Amino acid sequence: MVLVRGGYKLEKFLQLLTVLLQEAKDPASLLKRLLTILVAVIIFLFVSNTSEVMSFLKTFSTSAVLQDVQTQRIDNFPNVAREKSMVLFSQTGADAVFVVKYKPDAINDYSNIIAWESNAQLDRADLADKAVNKTSELYRRHLEGFNYASDLTVKVNKYMGKNIPSFKNVIFNYIYTCPYFNLNNIYAGYIGIAWRDKPVDIADSEQFKEYLTKLCSPQQRSLGRSI
């Protein structure tokens, strides 16, 4: 029944086009008729495929909005990272707080410092992309969702892999790190809270880590929601 009705409409439409062309008496009239036919064809196709057209427009509109939101989120992420670094720098009294982001997204071949809060100045070389050591204890612990303290005052097996690239102008012997995960729950980078010297004695180490975990947790979540 639907096919018959659709065929009937198409037949009537073709008859209308034939009449319009036959009534053209000169080139100017023919051009006007052709423009009229073009408009008629567009209207006919739209009316005949209303559901498909509306579905396409809805999908296109949704995709465009989502893409725009994602672009704004990416562009604003460094600002969010700087804000979180400032908060933790004030709360912890650390010598430096920084945010590292991995790239390409979900591949994590390189790391880059996108926010830095400290009285120490970073060298330009420290801001360059650094290859990620995925065999390091830091990376493996972060993948599992755990925070990790990199303590250079404790000797470790040299084959474990370097956790954090060295800084050119300053040495940090203790860096507490908190991983953050993006909206797709993919490990995207980490927050580093750094001291030149270990800030507490070994006896207070675990309590100190618990304290840093509490401070870092809301900033981790905020970064994750922003990327």
Curated annotation (Swiss-Prot):
Specify whether Transmembrane is a keyword of the entry: yes
Tell me which domain of life the UniProt entry assigns to the organism this sequence originates from.
Answer: Viruses
* The keyword Disulfide bond belongs to this UniProt entry's keyword annotation: yes
Tell me which UniProt keywords the record has, alphabetically: Cytolysis, Disulfide bond, Host cell inner membrane, Host cell lysis by virus, Host cell membrane, Host membrane, Membrane, Signal-anchor, Transmembrane, Transmembrane helix, Viral release from host cell
For the Periplasmic compartment, the record's topological domain ranges are 49-227
GO CC terms for this protein? host cell plasma membrane; membrane
Q: List the disulfide bonds.
A: 178-216
Q: What is its main location?
A: host cell
Q: Name one GO molecular function term.
A: pore-forming activity
Q: Which residues cross the membrane?
A: 34-48
Topology relative to the membrane, per the entry?
Single-pass type II membrane protein
Q: Kindly give the InterPro entries that the UniProt entry links to this protein.
A: Phage_T4_GpT_holin
Query: Can you summarize the PTM annotation of this record?
Result: Disulfide bond is required for functionality.
Q: Which residues lie on this side of the membrane: Cytoplasmic?
A: 1-33
Q: One of this protein's GO BP terms?
A: viral release from host cell by cytolysis
The subcellular location is:
Host cell inner membrane
Q: What induces it?
A: Expressed in the early phase of the viral replicative cycle.
Per the entry, what this protein does is: Accumulates harmlessly in the cytoplasmic membrane until it reaches a critical concentration that triggers the formation of micron-scale pores (holes) causing host cell membrane disruption and endolysin escape into the periplasmic space. Determines the precise timing of host cell lysis. Regulated by specific antiholins that somehow sense superinfections and then delay lysis. Participates with the endolysin and spanin proteins in the sequential events which lead to the programmed host cell lysis releasing the mature viral particles from the host cell.
Subunit description: Homomultimer. Heterotetramer composed of 2 holin and 2 antiholin. The holin-antiholin complex binds dsDNA. Interacts (via C-terminus) with antiholin (via C-terminus); this interaction blocks the holin homomultimerization and delays host cell lysis. Interacts (via N-terminus) with the lysis inhibition accessory protein rIII; this interaction stabilizes the holin-antiholin complex thereby resulting in a robust block of the hole formation.
Q: What is known of its domains?
A: The C-terminus serves, in association with the antiholin, as a DNA sensor for lysis inhibition under superinfection conditions.
By sequence similarity, the record places it as follows: Belongs to the T4likevirus holin family.
Please give the name of this protein.
Answer: Holin
Protein's gene: C1
